Amino acid sequence: STDGTEEIALEYVKKDERFKYVFQENGGVSKARNIGAAQALGTYILPLDADDKLEETYIEKALSHFTHHPETLLVYCQWGFFGEATNHSQVSYKGYAKLLVNNEIFCSSVFRKSDMLRIGGFDEDMHLGLEDWEFYIRLLDEQSIVYQIQEPLFFYRIKAISKNVTAAQNIAEVENYIYQKHIRRYSLYYGSAILPLRRLFLCEKELEDCKARIARHKNKWYRRLFYKYIKGNLKKK
């Protein structure tokens, strides 16, 4: 990193001996998470990317649920966005079959370190995204108990970066990698139709996102002015 991350991290290490700074050459998200988990001394793991945020009660509430419901395999919460968007997501886990089609759990969930090690951690061959989705496909199964805290306690930063053809190609490549890696699981639930089903799901999701964006601007003054201008020009013609 060239943004002074090391200096900032070392300052926190000096302030609190519970912090540990571990340096590694950039090897991707999966490798960083695996190395961090290997160094962790606690029972539970919560991955957190540098540009995302947690409410201070998230960990407390997650661990409380594990304590009272030890059969739970994974805990997460509702989540919101900040940066270029400030809305909240209404997505929730609807079972393992739906998870195979689309990831409904964000990256900063809470799970046991022993379970992470049991399945071999995150896939370090993945460098183009969706690492957390592939991880959950291996971590969970049809019988797994997943609990969602009904509060937005995690916030994901939305950056002002437009999607492009290369990004779409990367996602398609990763989807195919995940499908080929877990072809037996997919065949059990969907046969060979999973990739077309996911394409359809993503199209529907994009449509719903567009509807939501339109609704947020429906009664804005500039929208009314725009339509007034358009109608005026049409009448002139």
Give the predicted meaning of each segment.
Residues 52-53, 79, 126:
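Acidic metal-phosphate-binding loop of nucleotide-sugar-dependent transferases
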Residues 24-40:
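Glycine-rich, basic loop-to-helix element that forms the pyrophosphate-binding segment
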Residues 170-237:
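Boundary detector for helix-to-coil junctions that initiate low-complexity/charged tails
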Residues 45:
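Short aromatic/hydrophobic "clamp" motif used to bind/position activated sugar donors
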Residues 57-88:
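Conserved donor NDP-sugar-binding/catalytic core segment of glycosyltransferases
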Residues 95-177:
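Conserved nucleotide-sugar donor-binding catalytic segment
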Residues 6-10, 42, 55-67:
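Short alpha-helix within the catalytic core of nucleotide-sugar-dependent glycosyltransferases
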Residues 1-7, 49:
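A conserved acidic beta->alpha catalytic loop
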